[in-house]
Structure formats: structure tokens, C-alpha cells
Design a protein with these regions (language model features):
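Membrane-embedded alpha-helical bundles of multi-pass transporters/translocases
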Residues: 1-237
């Protein structure tokens, strides 16, 4: 969710605000990502102690969906204001952080469930699954973002701009030349293409989060009460 939004955000800022201003705007949006994640980590223990995790997940899903709805309307229904955009980003990143932490706790609780069933702990297996899922998610995010860019017709323009940045890094092109060329590339992008990009960067996270939430609701049975019973049974052995 959050990482995918950051990946999409780079191209979003290129074509919505122009290449010249995109650098600072991407930086600010990334700061919102870090701030939202840190605040969610700081407040998770307090919030989770006052409600069930499934209730917390439900609230997070609703808030994230609302955030993406606002992002979809940004510049169309809502004013094209940078402060508003960063506030929307903070809301999405904060609740996504809470959601991720709740899922991590739920995954860790399966260690005791596994111990109850099989008589031994498999901490290393759970750790390996988490590590693999992070790497897999990173690869999927890159693939999905590339697919959305291709379908919207922006992929070639995005690659051309990235190529300019590489040339500047090599010293074969000045920043002024890169800026001029990048603006020329960005000017080729039509409003319908940026709309398709916006739809992709909103629809993909919403659909994946909805699917994950439905899967958890149907398949995950270790509630707080069940977990306490599991721990009690293990301790009594």
C-alpha cells in the first residue's frame, strides 16, 4: 500500500506539478510517509489496548479508503493544494502503518498456535515468511507500477525522464538541459493519461487491501480471547 503509493507518487508529481517542482514535492510526500509510519508505531500500543484488532483493521480500512477517495478527487473535486495533498498522504500512511502493525502481531500470534498444535515453536519459519513477503511485495509493487504506467501510456515518458536524471548523474548533461528536456517530455502527456495513472494508483491499493481484509476476516481465527486460551494451555503443559 504505502510503498506502492510512494512509487506511483514520483510519476504523479512529475505530471501533475511539473518536473521542476517535483523534487521538493516528492521529498515532502516522503516525509509524510515517514512521519505517518513513526506516529502509527508510537501510538499502536495505546490504540490496540482499547479495541480488538479486527475492529482496528476495520477502522484502518475505512480511513485508508477515505484517504484514497480524497486522493482521487484531488485537483478534480478538491483544490490542487500541496498542503491538502500532504495531509491526505499522512492520513493514508498513518492508518496503513497501524494496519501493517496489526497484521504483524496477528502473524506472530500464529507461533503459539503452531506450538499448541505441534508441540514446538517455529519462530524462524514465521520470520522467513515475513522476510519473503516483504521482498515479494517489493517486486510486485514494481511490476504493478510499471503495468499501470504502460496502460496509461506514460511509461515511455517516465523512462525518458529517468534517463535524463542518469545523464545528469554521469555528468554528460547539465541540470538545466535535463530540466528543459524533462518539461518537454512531460508536456506530451495528455490529461486522460494522468487520469488513468490516478485511477491506477488509487484502485490497485484499494482492491488489494480489500482482498486482504476479506481473507483475514474469513480465515484468521486467532482473536485476542483465543490467543489467551492458547497461551494458558501452553503454560499449563
Amino acid at each position: 500500500g504505502s510503498n506502492l503509493l510512494i512509487i506511483f507518487g514520483v510519476n504523479f508529481f512529475y505530471f501533475e506539478f511539473g518536473y521542476a517542482d517535483s523534487g521538493n514535492l516528492i521529498f515532502l510526500f516522503t516525509v509524510m510517509y515517514g512521519l505517518g509510519t513513526l506516529v502509527s508505531q508510537a501510538l499502536y500500543a495505546f490504540i490496540s489496548s482499547r479495541m480488538h484488532r479486527m475492529t482496528l483493521l476495520k477502522i484502518c480500512i475505512a480511513a485508508i479508503f477515505a484517504g484514497y477517495a480524497l486522493l482521487m478527487g484531488f485537483g478534480y473535486v478538491l483544490p490542487k493544494n500541496v498542503v491538502l495533498l500532504n495531509c491526505i498522504g499522512f492520513v493514508i500512511f498513518f492508518f496503513q502503518g497501524l494496519y501493517n502493525l496489526a497484521v504483524i502481531v496477528m502473524l506472530n500470534n500464529t507461533i503459539e498456535y503452531d506450538e499448541l498444535r505441534f508441540g514446538e515453536r517455529h519462530d524462524s519459519v514465521i520470520s522467513a515468511i515475513r522476510s519473503f513477503s516483504v521482498k515479494l511485495a517489493g517486486a510486485v509493487n514494481q511490476g504493478v507500477s510499471a503495468l499501470v504506467l504502460i496502460l496509461s501510456g506514460i511509461y515511455t515518458v517516465s523512462q525518458n525522464i529517468s534517463g535524463l536524471e542518469i545523464e545528469v548523474g554521469k555528468g554528460t548533461m547539465t541540470s538545466a538541459q535535463a530540466l528543459e528536456n524533462a518539461n518537454a517530455f512531460a508536456a506530451q502527456v495528455q490529461p486522460r493519461q494522468t487520469l488513468l495513472l490516478r485511477i491506477g494508483m488509487v484502485a490497485v491499493p484499494i482492491l488489494t487491501l480489500a482482498a486482504a481484509y476479506i481473507l483475514i476476516r474469513k480465515k484468521y481465527k486467532i482473536t485476542e480471547e483465543v490467543y489467551q486460551k492458547i497461551v494458558t494451555e501452553i503454560t499449563a503443559r
